[in-house]
C-alpha cells in the first residue's frame, strides 16, 4: 500500500470511528465497519419485513456485500443512527428540512427536527409570522408544572408548553393557556450518561437555559406594549429558534444547523447581526440569514441598503426567488 493510500485509509477510518461506529457495550469496544453495515442492513430488513420476498432479500444481500466492500456507500445518516434509534425517529434520516414560522407547532417541530440531527431552514417573513396567534399576559396565581420527559419529543414539547401558556388561541397544549409554567427537569438524565445509540446525554442545563431565555424574550415583548395582547415579531421568532438551537447537542455529535429567511423590508432582521451582536445576542451565531428577494420587484435603493449590510458585516445573504413561499434548507 502506498503512503498516499495509507493516509486515505487512516482518514477514512478515523472519520468512521469518530462519527459513525457505535459503542458495543457487550464487547466493550466500538463496532467494526462490517458490524455497522450489518446493523444498517438489518434495520432495512426489519422496516420492510412484511414486504420481503426471496427476490428482494437477494437484492438486499447483494447491496450489503457492495456496502461492506466499500464499492458503494449508503446514506450516512443511516450509518450514524441506523437501528431502533432511526426506526423510532425516522426524521433522523434527513440531513436538512425547511418550513415556515406560520403556526404554533412550528417551534416544537423545529426543536424536534434539530434534536433528530436535521438542519432546519425556516422563514420568518412577515406574511408567514402574521399567521401566528397573538400572545397575552399570563395570570400570576395560575401555576402548572410540566415534567419534561427524557426524550427528544419531551424536549420539543417543553417549548410547545411554554408558548401555549402565552398564545391566545390555537395552542398545542391548551391546558397551559394563561398559566405560569414551572418546568421539572428531574426525569432528564445527567450530562455524560449514555443514551440510545451509544451517545452521551447533554444533561438538562442547555434546555433549562433555553426555556428561561425564551420566556424572558416573550415577557420583554409584552412589557414593551400597553396592550394585553401583542403579535410576535419576526425577530422574536428568529431568536426563539436560536435559543432552541443553542440547547441542542444532537445525538451527542454536533450542534444545530439553521438558515433563516426574512422579508426585504424587515429592518430588525436585516440588522440582526450588526454591532455587538456576538456579545449581546450570541445565539444568533447558530444561523445563516438570507433576505428573500422576489425577481423583478427589487429597487436599486433596496439593493444598495442590503449590500451595505453585507459589506459591513458579511450578512445577510440574499436569495432571488420567483415566489416568496419557496423555502430553502441549510
PLM-predicted stretches and their roles:
Residues 1-330:
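Extended catalytic cores of very large enzyme megasubunits
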Amino acid at each position: 500500500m502506498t503512503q498516499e493510500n495509507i493516509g486515505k485509509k487512516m482518514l477514512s477510518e478515523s472519520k468512521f470511528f469518530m462519527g459513525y461506529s457505535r459503542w458495543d457495550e457487550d464487547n466493550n469496544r466500538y463496532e467494526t465497519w462490517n458490524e455497522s453495515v450489518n446493523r444498517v442492513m438489518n434495520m432495512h430488513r426489519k422496516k420492510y419485513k412484511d414486504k420481503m420476498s426471496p427476490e428482494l432479500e437477494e437484492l438486499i444481500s447483494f447491496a450489503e456485500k457492495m456496502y461492506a466492500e466499500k464499492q458503494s456507500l449508503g446514506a450516512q445518516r443511516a450509518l450514524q443512527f441506523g437501528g431502533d434509534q432511526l426506526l423510532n425517529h425516522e426524521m433522523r434520516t434527513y440531513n436538512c428540512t425547511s418550513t415556515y414560522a406560520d403556526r404554533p407547532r412550528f417551534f416544537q417541530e423545529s426543536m424536534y427536527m434539530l434534536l433528530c440531527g436535521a438542519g432546519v431552514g425556516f422563514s420568518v417573513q412577515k406574511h408567514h409570522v402574521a399567521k401566528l396567534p397573538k400572545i397575552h399576559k399570563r395570570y400570576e396565581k395560575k401555576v402548572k408544572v410540566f415534567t419534561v420527559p427524557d426524550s427528544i419529543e419531551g424536549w420539543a414539547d417543553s417549548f410547545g408548553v411554554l408558548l401555549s401558556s402565552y398564545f391566545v388561541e390555537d395552542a398545542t397544549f391548551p391546558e397551559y393557556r394563561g398559566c405560569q409554567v414551572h418546568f421539572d427537569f428531574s426525569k432528564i438524565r445527567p450530562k455524560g450518561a449514555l443514551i440510545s445509540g451509544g451517545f452521551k446525554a447533554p444533561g438538562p442545563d442547555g434546555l433549562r437555559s433555553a426555556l428561561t431565555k425564551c420566556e424572558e424574550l416573550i415577557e420583554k415583548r409584552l412589557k414593551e406594549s400597553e396592550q394585553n395582547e401583542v403579535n410576535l415579531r419576526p425577530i422574536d421568532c428568529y431568536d426563539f429558534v436560536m435559543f432552541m438551537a443553542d440547547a441542542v447537542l444532537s445525538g451527542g455529535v454536533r450542534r444545530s444547523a439553521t438558515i433563516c429567511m426574512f422579508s426585504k423590508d424587515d429592518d430588525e432582521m436585516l440588522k440582526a447581526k450588526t454591532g455587538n451582536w456576538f456579545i449581546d445576542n450570541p445565539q444568533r451565531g447558530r444561523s445563516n440569514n438570507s433576505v428573500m428577494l422576489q425577481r423583478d420587484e427589487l429597487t436599486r435603493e433596496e439593493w444598495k441598503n442590503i449590500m451595505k449590510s453585507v459589506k459591513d458585516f458579511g450578512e445577510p445573504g440574499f436569495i432571488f426567488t420567483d415566489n416568496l413561499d419557496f423555502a430553502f434548507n441549510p
